[in-house]
Amino acid sequence: MNVNTVNFGDIIKEIGHGLMAESYISDNEFTKPCEYLRLVDIDDGVIAENCIEIVYDSKRFEKYAIKDGDVILSTTDKNFKVICAGDMGDRKLLVSPTLIRIGLDKEKADPYYIAAYLSSAEGKAMLDGCRSGKVLRVLHTKGLKECEIPLPTMEEQREIGEK
């Protein structure tokens, strides 16, 4: 099978790290409770049922909130924990700074395929090559957007993502 490769940045609509939990806490009329997703809350591609609860400023929520179909990956873990946040329903989750939240252009890429690729040995090797730093190698959004990834047809992506 001959698969095209694309610049990862070309299929990303939004990307970013989270903030420290203390950065969300504010005392005004816009504060609401939500869950805070940390690296330890991800196990074998699944988000824990009960993440810690914090209070956040709802005016700032959208920038850091996990949305349906977002791909979440770790920045420092050598094994790169990766998940696809399917249907979030009413669950409100914010990401910590040790995670990157990627909102994809779903017309171009299937989130489950991207999560499956990034979880594969080939994908982890690609992610490792995108990291920077001499002592603590960290994955940054800029480097990630510049990586090349294989992108089969949408039909093939869906087949792979469903496995």
Map each language-model feature to its residues.
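Short coil/turn segments at secondary-structure boundaries
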Residues: 22-29, 130-131
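Membrane-cytosol interface segments
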Residues: 31-33
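A short beta-sheet element
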Residues: 38, 62-64, 68, 73-118
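Short, positively charged
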Residues: 110-140
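A short glycine-rich beta-alpha junction/loop motif
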Residues: 93-98, 132-158
